Amino acid sequence: MITLRPLLLLVAFISFSGCATNLHSSASATTPTATYQPGELNGETLFDILSAELAANQDHYDYTLKKYLKQAELTRDPNLAKRAASIAQYLRDTQALSKAVKLWIIADPSEPEPRQILANILITQGKFTEALPHFKTALDQGQGKALLLITSQLGKMSDTEVTSYIELLEAVDIDASLNNDRLVSLGILQRHLKQYDLALQNFNRALKSSADLPNALYQKAETLKSLNRYTEALSTVQLLLADAADDRQYNALEIQLLFLLKKNKQGIAKIDLLITKNENDVPLQNYLALTALDFNQLDKSKSILEKLLRSSPINSSPYFYLGIIAERNDQPLQAIENYLQVDSGSNLLQAHPRAISLHKKSADKKKVENITEQLIASHKENQTTYLLMLADWLNKFEFRQDAISLLDKNIQLQDENPALLYTRAMYLEPVDSPAAERDFKRVLALTPENAVALNAYGYTLTVHTNRYQEALTLIERALTLPPKAPATIDSMGWVLYKLKRYEEAIRYLSQAYLLYDDPEVASHLIAALAGNNDLERARQLFIKISNSPPDNKFVEQARQSLESK
């Protein structure tokens, strides 16, 4: 293997010497014609590195990266690969960085740093299975940074992927200096899978080795909380607070535990103390208000939220939570007023529908229409959401024709709005299935991969026509797309029942019922069981759903399925 470190030093010297010659574009540069000889320091390598460093001296880093990647690949020199990786990191070019570190690993398999970098890249990209061998090699070579990264990505990992990392961490022969980090990471992964007892064992093993590991203590406290061992959890977090009294994470956990232990006065006192110490910290005060709300400490939550509104009237977000408090206090008019005062932020489209939903009488129709009109005028960007909100309210209170007329009017203005078309189709389906079918077709012309519309159209065909094979094709397509909702699985079972493919129907309908034990799904499963002459299971399921309201039409349909046998 050639060693280019002296050449890199020479190039660095030339770069810092302030060469005044401007770098020509790559198109105008003339590359030496010498034939490249792998493993030798030849003219092409020298020319590329010199031109790359001169380019870097003039901030042309893309050119520099291109040349270093080329020569790293040709020479298999680890120093060139490392330089390419460094430039790619500076440019935040993940694709180039992946290529550079892979070349670096090939050039120097014993070097741990590129393994660490590659593991980090793959983990960040969510390629957890692909990252696993590099993660292991990095640990074997004493690189522990990936432990922190993998625990930070748990929300993106499947249970199978988490299990693979648990098995690796249980088996890996790791440097003693990293063992406590391994145990804590292992415990965090196990806690994610709700393996609380195993997680607790690993946190305790780490603490036995070093009694003052903050992360191990904190994770232990959280695990004890998950096991409902609140007193032990409180004692553990208070050990942390003895050395870090102002740590927000520790204080937040202590407050939760105080409320869980019904020590409400102490919890409120702790909230007051934190607010006094952090009078200008709006995010902290907002968090404390929501914590109080979570534990139904409504008066305390309300007082903090009202204080936040006084200090910053322009921020309307607290009104959303004041609306929730008013609802819990059985004050619907106050709740409506609060919800409607939310005029921006992430809760806007939760607040306004909640305000509408609190109008619980058909006599409120004019009021609801006026509110919706005002909301559309104030928030034109959310017009579709508000129209659907109003249509849903009208349909719920048996103003179906008014809901359809509302959608007709707005579809004339927005004839390519799939949400309006889909909603009208759903309202038309019970009363005018051909019109509903036309709308479903328009929705699918606009959004061909719309799994919800594919399912709804397919199910409509099973209910109103005998075009079962066409319905099956639509529902099969829906099942290949996300989300694989229980409703789609139910539709698949139902169309198979219509096709008299009873055993297949039972498999799908049983799966749907496990996911969503609704009387409609149950009635479909009972029909399929009866069709397959499995009357005992059908009767047992009917007994289970017969406690539904006596006028439930699906219970009656299930009864008819049994009586027909």
Per-range role (PLM):
Residues 24-34:
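Short, low-complexity, disordered segments immediately C-terminal to signal peptides
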Residues 1-8:
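Bacterial N-terminal signal peptides that target proteins for export
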Residues 17-18:
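C-terminal motif of bacterial Sec signal peptides marking the signal peptidase cleavage site
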Residues 11:
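Flanking scaffold residues of small Cys/His-coordinated metal-binding clusters
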Residues 3, 25-27, 104:
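Disordered, low-complexity tails and leader-like regions
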Residues 21, 36-57, 66-565:
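Alpha-solenoid helical repeat scaffolds
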